[in-house]
Amino acid sequence: MADERAPQRSTSGPRKKRPFQRRKVCRFCADKQVTIDYKDPRTLRYFVSERGKIIPRRISGNCSKHQREITEAIKRARNIALLPIAGSHATA
């Protein structure tokens, strides 16, 4: 009676597969006329979370070249106070 335990579940069982999701396409590669400008906070806000963090490229869908440009533009916009450094809900 002392060894009456629930049966252990194996962790190597079949896993549920994620449904296939279409790969996001970099909007800057798709539309060559759209440019990344640090003086345009409206465009940059799309790539910043509400807490003020830069959204990673696996979520935003940017290619690595444009993600680096976005990151630099966001940092420049923060430096000249066009974008807040922290989100609107942050307290210090």
Curated annotation (Swiss-Prot):
Gene assigned in the entry: rpsR
Homology family: Belongs to the bacterial ribosomal protein bS18 family.
Gene3D superfamilies from the UniProt entry: Ribosomal protein S18
Entry keyword set: Ribonucleoprotein, Ribosomal protein, RNA-binding, rRNA-binding
Annotated protein name in UniProt: Small ribosomal subunit protein bS18
GO biological processes: translation
GO terms assigned for molecular function: small ribosomal subunit rRNA binding; structural constituent of ribosome
PANTHER family on file: 30S RIBOSOMAL PROTEIN S18 (PTHR13479), SMALL RIBOSOMAL SUBUNIT PROTEIN BS18M (PTHR13479:SF40)
Subunit and interaction comment: Part of the 30S ribosomal subunit. Forms a tight heterodimer with protein bS6.
GO CC term (a single one): cytosolic small ribosomal subunit
Region (Disordered): 1-22
Lineage of source species: Bacteria, Pseudomonadati, Thermodesulfobacteriota, Desulfuromonadia, Geobacterales
InterPro entries hit by this protein: Ribosomal_bS18, Ribosomal_bS18_CS, Ribosomal_bS18_sf
Described purpose of this protein according to its UniProt entry: Binds as a heterodimer with protein bS6 to the central domain of the 16S rRNA, where it helps stabilize the platform of the 30S subunit.
HAMAP family: Ribosomal_bS18
Keyword Metal-binding: no
